[in-house]
Amino acid sequence: MANSSPVYDWFQERLEIQDIADDVTSKYVPPHVNIFYCLGGITLVCFLIQFATGFAMTFYYKPTVTEAYNSVSYLMTDVSFGWLIRSVHRWSASMMVLMLILHVFRVYLTGGFKRPRELTWVTGVVMAVITVAFGVTGYSLPWDQVGYWAVKIVSGVPAAIPVVGDFMVELLRGGESVGQTTLTRFYSLHTFVLPWTLAIFMLMHFLMIRKQGISGPL
């Protein structure tokens, strides 16, 4: 690069950052690609917003059955811009689900799931399931009447599964009934297990797209 700085030269000599930049910026984009091919990227942006706003809320949220509701109320009424942070979190959650659904339809209608992109489709389906799990676990965290009964109903659904149903219910609830252990498990899932699992599958998803390229037109 002409007129490069000493700092740039130092990194270029060791990491060859220009080659990386050229690879990222010079990828061929097929002429049939339109705005509907951006739905996956918009879903990623929504996830990043979720991550940032969710991280901000962890400074104030208290995952106990006695303090969860009051901590959310405090965030909404007393914390500067707390209402905005939580509202953006909720809006981006809805937007993420909507963009995910539209993205799945686009991929299906354009045949993006066909050979050799079957694994890309599989990772996408897994991420869709994780996104739904995000909604279920996040819905319970305010621990109000809606959240409590939602958890009770959802965690009781596996009881209909033969043999392992009762075990799965107890695993989700942390006991025979819904209580503090249930809230703790849902909080851990929502703030740690699910985000990192989704991030791993996103990385796999993007690497496969990067390797195989965008599918052709029908």
Curated annotation (Swiss-Prot):
Bound cofactor: record note: Binds 2 heme b groups non-covalently with two histidine residues as axial ligands.
Transmembrane intervals: 35-55, 93-113, 119-139, 189-209
Keyword Iron found: yes
GO biological process: photosynthesis; respiratory electron transport chain
Co-factor requirement: heme b; heme c
Main location: membrane
UniProt binding sites for heme b 1: H103, H205
Location relative to the cell: Cellular thylakoid membrane
Source organism superkingdom: Bacteria
Chain coiled-coil ranges: none
Membrane topology note: Multi-pass membrane protein
Keyword field: Electron transport, Heme, Iron, Membrane, Metal-binding, Photosynthesis, Thylakoid, Transmembrane, Transmembrane helix, Transport
GO molecular function per UniProt: electron transporter, transferring electrons within cytochrome b6/f complex of photosystem II activity; metal ion binding; oxidoreductase activity
Alphabetized Gene3D superfamilies for the sequence: Cytochrome Bc1 Complex, Chain C
Pfam families: Cytochrome_B
Residues that hold heme c according to the record: C38
Its job: Component of the cytochrome b6-f complex, which mediates electron transfer between photosystem II (PSII) and photosystem I (PSI), cyclic electron flow around PSI, and state transitions.
Miscellaneous comment: Heme 1 (or BH or b566) is high-potential and absorbs at about 566 nm, and heme 2 (or BL or b562) is low-potential and absorbs at about 562 nm.
PANTHER family attached to this UniProt entry: CYTOCHROME B
Name of the protein in question: Cytochrome b6
Designated gene of the protein: petB
